[in-house]
Amino acid sequence: MNRTIKDCVYGLAVGDTLGVPFEFRPRNTFNATTMTSGGVWNQPIGTWSDDTSMTIATCDALRENNKKIDLKAIQRNFVIWKDYDAYTAHNNTFDVGNTTAQALDRRVGLDDLYSNGNGSLMRIAPFNLY
């Protein structure tokens, strides 16, 4: 993995880790100026979320396939993350969205009206860097 990709993933992970304890809280009810624990998921300090885990899983699939997009490899890594706690900060998968869980359990994307979220936007960085 080259330096630019590492820097991008590190930046994503740090920002994500700062935000995990404050997820789902209204603005202006907290100061995210230092690493802290807790939050809705009661996670220890230094925990990143599904966003970083799935970004790392995507990078791993791209690395494994010589920078070629292999959707099956990405899907496999996402399933390993969800079911076996891979790519997590503390060997604990949490905050798996319903749409993500259903798609991974079925091994196919969903196409109903309410299955379109913003998760892909948070995991697209590796495709721009590889």
What are these regions (language model features)?
Residues 1-130:
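Structured, active/binding-site neighborhoods that engage oxygen-rich ligands
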